[in-house]
Amino acid sequence: MALTKEEKRQIIEKFRLNENDSGSPEVQIALLTERIKKLTEHLKVHKKDYHSRVGLLKMIGRRRKLLKYLQEKDFERYKKLIQELGLRK
């Protein structure tokens, strides 16, 4: 369920804004999206894992807040990010 160091490193390299960036909204949203995808797959198999479901809902809420922040701050970066991640249609 958790992301490995290698998976995190690849996501950070893909979405970072500069060499030392690991905390920009884009990186945070991309990491949360990957964790949400993995946890969603886990919950398809383990339907009664309510504790993980609560964690999933918290992650979705955190991602939603970060997306809203990015949308208000820089709409072009927001549009590019949701297109790259395949969020919203």
Swiss-Prot record:
GO terms for molecular function: rRNA binding; structural constituent of ribosome. It holds the Pfam family Ribosomal_S15. GO terms for cellular component: cytosolic small ribosomal subunit. InterPro entries: Ribosomal_uS15, Ribosomal_uS15_bac-type, uS15_NS1_RNA-bd_sf. The keyword Acyltransferase does not apply. SMART domains: Ribosomal_S15 (SM01387). One of the primary rRNA binding proteins, it binds directly to 16S rRNA where it helps nucleate assembly of the platform of the 30S subunit by binding and bridging several RNA helices of the 16S rRNA. Forms an intersubunit bridge (bridge B4) with the 23S rRNA of the 50S subunit in the ribosome. Belongs to the universal ribosomal protein uS15 family. This is Small ribosomal subunit protein uS15. It comes from Dictyoglomus turgidum (strain DSM 6724 / Z-1310).
